[in-house]
Structure formats: structure tokens, C-alpha cells
């Protein structure tokens, strides 16, 4: 694992969280129970405090950072998709930030909201609960439906379960030289399917 103390501040990681060995946590970082942090995520707490509350996930290649005297927070069950950047912002409880989105300083994403993939949320934006935000710059398109929130929650549950599965079985290995006969397929833990347009 890549954990670094910075000016006496050491990352805090709950024993029931999972942090991929290639992720980097520096300084003032606090990770709660059941959190999943994916490969190559960078949490650079060398200025502001970075907080991932219980059940949140920060997927592959995500970046968290913020200015001094600010907290960048992903609240409980927050879901941060691959490649997203969070800088000095607050992500509400049970909200989703889509892949490769950018959330800027002082922005607040309301609880149970969804930020569509590739969106850019400007500094200082203050959202309400259950908003669907789309575009660059992101604009409120409509309210999040019950169906969309259910889909989001299934995906978040998958990552909470993945944290447990990774703690139990993920290990470094050497590749095989050929595909074995009857190679099994991995399965998730919920009935979630990719969202269609």
C-alpha cells in the first residue's frame, strides 16, 4: 500500500475499508468503514482534508485534492466513477459522480443526486437533493427518478461487496500463458445491469 505521512499527518483507514495497493494516500486523509478505493486513485491530503465516509467508493484513477482549510468530502454511500476529479467539493449522501467528471472547489452535490459522466461542475455550485446534472458546464436537467436511485444504490452495493471480496481474495500473481479449459466467469452480488440510454 502507498501511504505517506505529511508534516506529521498520517492517513486513517478503517480496517473494514479496502484500498488497492496501487492507490496513493498522502497526509490528511480519513477513510471510513466499507469504503472501496480502486487502482491508481490519488488522495493527496497535503493541503485540505479528504474524507470518504462509510460505504463510499472512489474508483480507478480518481483524484481527490483541495485547498488549505477546506474539506473534500464524499458522504456516506457516495459513488465516484472511474477517472473523476474531486477538488475541494462536497458530495452528498448516496450521490453518484459519473466517470471522468470534474467537481470544482466549493461545489456541493446534493444527496441522492447523479452527475452524468464527463460533466464539469463549476466552483461554488450548490445543488439540491435528487438532481440529475449533465454537461460542461453541468446544468440541472431534472430530478433523479426512483428507478435511477435504485440503480445507483445497486451499483454502490456492488462496490461495498467488492471491498469485502478484495480484502478476502485479491492477491498479486503471475499470469497464465494460456486460457484454461472451462474458465469461470466472475459474478456480482446484485442484479444490477448497465444503464441503457
Curated annotation (Swiss-Prot):
Name under which the protein is recorded: Carnitine operon protein CaiE
Organism this protein belongs to: Citrobacter koseri (strain ATCC BAA-895 / CDC 4225-83 / SGSC4696)
This protein's pathway: Amine and polyamine metabolism; carnitine metabolism
Protein transport listed as a keyword: no
Alphabetical keyword list: Repeat, Transferase
GO biological process, any: carnitine metabolic process
Function: Overproduction of CaiE stimulates the activity of CaiB and CaiD.
Family of the protein in this entry: Belongs to the transferase hexapeptide repeat family.
Cross-referenced Pfam families: Hexapep
GO molecular function, one term: transferase activity
Source taxon at top rank: Bacteria
Record bears the keyword Repeat: yes
SUPFAM superfamilies (UniProt xref): Trimeric LpxA-like enzymes
